[in-house]
Amino acid sequence: MKKYITTTLLFASIFSLAQHIEIVPLGVYGGSDESNLSAYLVGEEGKNEYISMDGGTIYSGIKSAINNNTFKTDESSVLKNYIKGYFISHGHLDHLGGMIINSPEDSKKNIYGSPEMIKVLKENYFTNAAWANFGNEGETPILNKYQYNPYTDQEQFKIDGTILDAQIFELSHVNPWKSSALKVSTPTQSLIYFGDTGADRIEKSNKLNEVWKAIAPEIKSGKLKTIMLEVSFPNAQPEHLLFGHLTPKLLMEELNVLANYTGKNALKNLNVIVTHIKPKGDNPSIIKNELDSLNNLGIKFIYPQQGKRIIIN
């Protein structure tokens, strides 16, 4: 009996030490406000060891997080010490401009992404004509601050300086142009972040379908609790003018495809963090209302705010 109690307490202690994933949004919008563009710090709760999912806004987002008491240190410490690397989903400025602007003040770290995205950084941004070459390849002089780590569709790897394992997925963003998603995992929990993406039906691709098939087992087991996915426009936006983005209708269309692999019950209370809203006029409130009215799966929609921590339970 004593041995049983000791073993039970040991497992209870281990379980209590299991950490949740936390997200610190540095930027949440998909345009217009250059001080609040796509960038999310993701890491194990309480460790201050993050991968930055995209890098549209960095410094302004860190400052907002400090003002919200999310971080209790200065901006430079967060930039240099807390951010262990960047995942850049694709080569558009609203997803990487903040990283580039802050590169002179940053510390040495890795950039993870698809080979196509790494090529854009080397040939279009980290060049003498556009900025300076802070990468480890490309035009001379090579400053060697950022180490390029290209990975192909569904390849798995580790995020240096964190506990996180990762897997990259290819997306379609105005076919044939590409974007990507990244799934990150602790031993007990997973999350997947999507860069910009169109719906398979509009893009005439199967990229999202392949992601849904890949992540369905972890959703069914309860390990993957959170999807971070864009909704850029309200439903009124014509489908031929979406430019590789989603509306509430198209998001729910895709989540119902996911439900075909998981069963509808597995998606009840799944966290879907809505990213990349274009904040023109009343778009944010319209998108929220449309998602609520179309939510036939019991999804828990979360609307991130710059600088305010989200804990995934």
What are these regions (language model features)?
Residues 26, 116-179, 296-311:
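Metallo-beta-lactamase
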Residues 39, 43, 150-220:
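Catalytic core of the metallo-beta-lactamase
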Residues 1-21:
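Bacterial Sec-dependent N-terminal signal peptides
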Residues 74-141:
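Active-site HxH/HxHxD metal-binding segment of metal-dependent hydrolases
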Residues 52-56, 82-94, 112-114, 193-196, ...:
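Active-site neighborhood of phospho(di)ester-bond hydrolases with catalytic His/Asp-centered motifs
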Residues 32-87, 97-104, 203, 207-215:
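Pre-active-site segment of Zn-dependent metallo-hydrolases
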Residues 200-305:
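Cap/insert and terminal regions of metallo-dependent hydrolase folds
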